[in-house]
């Protein structure tokens, strides 16, 4: 009985032990489930993967065997850790016990490691574009739409943004891409190194040490750029100042983005003996400037597509606190122009290609010529709404810029024009209501007459300050003259039609007789334009006057070429016969040609052909304007010329459009530049302003009489025509006299 009871107690004790063990197992399983559920809810963006499906590039090997999370844990601690055997199979001999496992089994009955991988979220993996990066560095920037060019099916947008005082313009097929391009150009202007490797390489550190960024260390001097040592190497740069390292480190610890100017060059002056023209040779201006001011950065301000496959770049560089710009068909050419402008302005250095010699003493400084060209083209772009207007089409663009001396800071565009046509003979007017010649250079000169009349009319104003604003001052002997240092510069986008354009693409030798060019027979000859067409032909026959009835019956209306007319302005002046009653002759200081030019030949046809003119009266001279091309020559524009001419005068809001075939405005009215309008303005001035002509008497009744009243002007004009004939260059062809036989009207 006792044995039975003992065995019963023994069996009861065993069953109670098994029950306790099972309770403990259930308790451990429930705790393990709770841990897994807590982890799954906390790590929602994570997912579980088996070893066969993991991506080693994207996963983070984590272990959930321990509840502790330690900072700066070694990577080796995060490897696979199997559960202890006692935890999953106590004794290992109870196969009858079925348990649910929270994890999959594998690898011989061991639990697989729990692998957690961050989901590839778009916001976390997509790199920041230029717009976002620029906004983070410079918040609050304003992007503005500059222009929209191109056809409707393939538009080209231009968007600009101003950063650090510089305007960056980007172009693209959409506004978004143009905006992105502008942001990229702005970032390149002040972000020197896009990644750390380039920064260390540039600063002299080929490798960067491995750094634990999870440690508690605040600064990592070994991973930053090398600090500039206090200079004991000041032999090369005697004006150097050491960098304030304490200031840099303290600013870094405060976490500020720092702009600190390193005075590496001081007030160093160039070694002129080392940079003499003979030593410079054919060196690039960018290289020369870099020797004087090392470490300069060139910034691309704009990149515009003027035409298909034709781009224009504007580069800028800041030297000694001054900004210099250059433009060109490539960034390399634009950088060269900016560097040349800086060399000339700061160091008075001209490279051999820019140094005027004895044979080139009549050349205009290249940087000044480029500035005038840019002023004219930018003004035309502004008036045509970024070249989007239908009237932006042109084959030739001309403009006159007024300066005080050669200071481009005070330069002002006063007139603009475009056009390449002349009127048809059937539209000729005997009342002075049409503009006969609508070529850009000629229209620019007529617009300049409009400007001169406006300046003279200021002397009729009742306000005392108005005469002071005029470019004219009164002369004691009578009449008016230009104020001191007022200069006018003519810009033409292509060589003027006539002899200047005929020979411009070719090199002209010093000995003209040795030239083998096919047109040497007519070189320097007077030429006339083709009616309602383009191009010129040499003057034919000795007849100098056209007849009114012959033109009406079908004879071609002959107009002298632009080259010959500009040559006459260098003797007679720009003001014409009527204004000679009031002012002294006004001459051009320079002529700038955008393309198809040869400076030597241009000087010969503009000035040298009139060397035999003889002695001229007082206030008249044989003017020799300074000549220059531009660095950024305009590309050839194939296609037909537009049948209109546009003109603008300072003070006017919009362009005036003239039909080049009829010589009148597109609406049918007379242009502000026609003879009839000018004669009325002249009549209002006559008798109220002091004149240069003694005993001028009453106002003439006819336009032709007013022109003949300028006796000195007419005599110089005849003297010029005889000089052309004497040189064997042909006879100047005049319009029918009936054109000027109309009454003056007030």
Curated annotation (Swiss-Prot):
GO terms for molecular function: double-stranded RNA adenosine deaminase activity; double-stranded RNA binding; metal ion binding; tRNA-specific adenosine deaminase activity. The keyword Hydrolase applies. The gene is Adarb2. Its EC number is 3.5.-.-. Keywords: Hydrolase, Metal-binding, mRNA processing, Nucleus, Repeat, RNA-binding, Zinc. Brain specific. Gene3D superfamilies: 3.30.160.20. GO terms for cellular component: cytoplasm; nucleolus. The active site is at 441 (proton donor). This is Double-stranded RNA-specific editase B2. It comes from the Eukaryota. It comes from Rattus norvegicus. Residues 23-35 are annotated as: R-domain (ssRNA-binding). SMART domains: ADEAMc, DSRM. The keyword Zinc applies. Zn(2+) binds at residues 439, 497, 562. The lineage of its organism: Eukaryota, Metazoa, Chordata, Craniata, Vertebrata. One of its GO terms (biological process) is adenosine to inosine editing. PANTHER family: DOUBLE-STRANDED RNA-SPECIFIC EDITASE B2, EUKARYOTE SPECIFIC DSRNA BINDING PROTEIN.
